Structures are given as C-alpha cells and as structure tokens.
Amino acid sequence: MVKLPHIYEEIDIPENVTVEINGLKVKVNGPKGSIERDFSHVRNIILRKENSKIIVETFFADRRKKALVGTIASHIENMIKGVLKGYRYKLKIIYSHFPITVEVDDRNRIVRIKNFLGEKSDRIAKIIGEDVKVTVKGEDIIVEGIDIEHVGQTAANIELATKVKDKDRRVFADGIYIYDWGEEE
C-alpha cells in the first residue's frame, strides 16, 4: 500500500471569528457564542494556525489517517459555521385522533410529550448541551443552537421518543417528525 508523504486540508477563518489552537484542542469564538472541542484522542494529526487559516495535516498517511484529516477539518468547519450562523432543526407534530401536547422543561433539560396515542404516561426526550434552545410554536417544534451535534441529537431524541412499536406505521402515522434542517437564516 502506498503511503502519501503529506496530506493536509486548509480551513479559512472568517474575519469575525477567532480560533485558538492548543495542541489538539480547538476553541472557536464568534458572534453567536463559542465552541470548544478536544481532538486529543486522534493520533498522528497536527493542527496549526497560519495567518487566517487552520491547517490539519499528517505525514506518511495511510487510508485511515487521510480520512481523519478530512473528518477533523469538517468538524472545525461545522464549529465555525455554528458560531457564525447557528443551526436549526424543524419538527412537525402529527396526530390523527389524540391531540399531542409538547412542553419544554428548561430546568430539567427535557421535552415532555403528553397524550401521545392517548397514553396516560408522558414520553420524555433529553435536550443535549447547554446551548440548545427548544421552542414549540403550534404544530412546529424548533431546535436551535451553535453545536450541530447537540442540535441534531436533540431533534433525533424528540423524534425517537414518539416511535410507534408493534403497529403498522402506514395506519398509525402519529408522531413528531423532522422536516427541515440546516443553518439559521
């Protein structure tokens, strides 16, 4: 197998974003907030900052190291986009007979789903991360934040909390479903 001598990716840093690199720890500050991430579990990858660019590189890379360079570069790009614009997931509450009520408990960091399929007990979904904000507007649930992984996992937790088991999904279509996601406008 051929090992390439030098693999690297460059990430441009926008003007209103500051990036601090300490070894393999990256902290990104921007208008929406700051995100810190530790990549110290990754071996043989070098992170450095030159002028207004971040360089992720490795030497004598095999297939796995080459993939890691791209993965870490993508994580850092997502951090930069998050502190600049933020991320938003939109979910739709769908029911046919029993009206579903959704309440957000910010103190306990949970979303409480009541009266799903007429059930007496509430279904609970965890809100991941301190920076994630969940709001309910009529039939829509909006999950917003600066960390794409926390926002996406929170939306997935809400969707999975209303999963229907042992019934035909074509007939029992009740639930909460993700219908739109991406960067905030």
From Swiss-Prot:
Cited PANTHER family: 60S RIBOSOMAL PROTEIN L9, 60S/50S RIBOSOMAL PROTEIN L6/L9
Protein name: Large ribosomal subunit protein uL6
Domain of life: Archaea
Assembly mode: Part of the 50S ribosomal subunit.
HAMAP family: Ribosomal_uL6_A
Family membership: Belongs to the universal ribosomal protein uL6 family.
Gene Ontology terms: cellular component: cytosolic large ribosomal subunit
InterPro entries: Ribosomal_uL6-like, Ribosomal_uL6-like_a/b-dom_sf, Ribosomal_uL6_a/b-dom, Ribosomal_uL6_arc
Keywords for the protein's UniProt record, in alphabetical order: Ribonucleoprotein, Ribosomal protein, RNA-binding, rRNA-binding
Bridged cysteine pairs (disulfide): none
Coiled-coil ranges per UniProt: none
GO biological process: cytoplasmic translation
GO terms of molecular function: rRNA binding; structural constituent of ribosome
Alphabetical list of SUPFAM superfamilies matching this protein: Ribosomal protein L6
Main function: This protein binds to the 23S rRNA, and is important in its secondary structure. It is located near the subunit interface in the base of the L7/L12 stalk, and near the tRNA binding site of the peptidyltransferase center.
Keyword rRNA-binding in record: yes
UniProt entry tagged with the keyword Ribosomal protein: yes
